[in-house]
């Protein structure tokens, strides 16, 4: 279920059959890969009220949950069953619940499929390690 109004870049890949939920106000960059059970949703109150903005070349494993007014940088791998409600810098692997971040250049190498050249500029989604946007 991808909500009407979601902004999605070129090269979206949904691997295998299964439920995928994307909030209608979410923004996804180019070459994002979604696995079964992924939820990209909103937080309704608090300092993170809102929906995620997800960068280019992001792979989300099965049952990963990404919620709130947060930014996921470029070249990020979110491991299966991870719960993410904070900004994630470029070139990172996110794992666990609660999630933790591991810096890794080429984090999505070998994971992202259906790559296309027509991508949104990385600067549009970049997040530095200090959380600056």
Where are these predicted regions, by residue range?
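Structural signal for interior beta-strand "rungs" in well-ordered beta-sheet cores
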Residues: 1-95, 99-102, 107
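Terminal amphipathic alpha-helical/low-complexity segments used for targeting or macromolecular assembly
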Residues: 108-133
């Amino acid at each position: 279920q991808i909500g009407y109004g979601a902004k999605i870049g070129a090269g979206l890949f949904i691997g295998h059959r299964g439920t995928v939920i994307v909030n209608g106000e979410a923004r996804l960059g180019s070459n994002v890969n979604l696995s079964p059970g992924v939820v990209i949703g909103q937080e309704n109150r608090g300092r993170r009220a809102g929906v995620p903005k997800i960068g280019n070349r992001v792979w989300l494993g099965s049952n990963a949950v990404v919620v709130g007014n947060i930014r996921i940088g470029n070249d990020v791998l979110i491991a299966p069953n991870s719960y993410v409600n904070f900004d994630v810098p470029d070139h990172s692997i996110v794992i666990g619940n609660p999630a933790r971040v591991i810096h890794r250049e080429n984090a999505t190498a070998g994971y992202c499929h259906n790559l296309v050249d027509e991508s949104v500029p990385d600067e549009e989604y970049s997040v530095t390690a200090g959380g600056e946007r």
